[in-house]
Amino acid sequence: MQIGNITINGKLALAPMAGVTDLAFRHICREHGAALTVTEMVSAKALCYKDKKTPRLLELGADEHPAAAQIFGHEPDTMAEGAKLALEKSGCDIIDINMGCPAPKIVNNGDGSALMKEPELASKVIAAVVNAVDVPVTVKFRKGWDEKNVNCVEFAKMAEQSGAAAITLHGRTRSQQYSGTADWDAIREVKQAVSIPVFANGDVAEPEDAVRILAHTGADGVMIGRGSLGDPWLFERANALLETGICPALPPFAERIDTAVRQIELAAEQKGEHIAMLEARRHVNCYLKRESGVKTFKNRICALTRLSDLYEIADELKAFVSAKENI
């Protein structure tokens, strides 16, 4: 797939998720077959105001290419300057504009999916960013604001006309947030309406879902979000299913929990042990989502403060699951 002058060697991408797709998790997902990764969203205004914490969210791994940096905002000039800074600080291959985030604190500022209610302003934002950077610009948005205001087809056409090199459509409205089901028919309509690459997003939790959404929508790729939490193998298993028609099994539990530990070790290297442990409480428990009888372990994980505690819990978990499997 070509996004502007950037070649994406695969159909599966890791969606940007605030508080989730940090450098460590992106590294793990890329190891397991994600062809494109995207940073957590960063505020263009924060970049312009020289906020000290924001640039850290844009750090890419040494071999993390192709990768996109995602920015959000609604002021064309600020977004243009923010895009330049994001490119400068990250060395990314693509700038992605967030026009889909449904969070109240984002929408109430006129950012994220609020821009779907103002397509003329959204067009100015896209054009400003396209003119500001020399890398391809992509846009991620939703089906519409609510079921009475579904405008994804028109919005997609506008994005293409404004210079976007590719788009991602999450098949839910803003009012749905993450509830209900994603409308894959809407994604198909968008794909048929534009000539630039389209990533389908929404309700891909298993390898078979990736195959189905591509077949249903005709999209060029799949942007996988929440389904990848605790399951980076979703990428390699879906890739195998797409290429061979055969879906490999998940690796043994011991390998999965070791991967969780390595993710947190990588996070600790980047952010320090304290922050990594706070974030581990969510991440590690996601790796246990397929396991039964581990509530006690989950409670202990929610109180993690040190890597040494994580190592101890991981060893106990492996012994517990092994014993359970041998009954």
Regions found by a protein language model. Name each.
Residues Q2, M17-D93:
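Glycine-rich, positively charged N-terminal anion/phosphate-binding segment
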Residues L12-P16, T37-T39, A67-I71, I95, ...:
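Hydrophobic faces of well-ordered beta-strands that scaffold small-molecule active sites
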Residues M17-G19, V42-A44, F72-H74, G100-P102, ...:
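Active-site beta-loop-alpha junctions enriched in small/polar residues
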Residues G4, I8, L12, A18, ...:
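Alpha/beta catalytic cores of nucleotide-metabolism and tRNA/nucleoside-modifying enzymes
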Residues M116:
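Aromatic- and acidic-residue-enriched carbohydrate-binding clefts of CAZyme catalytic domains
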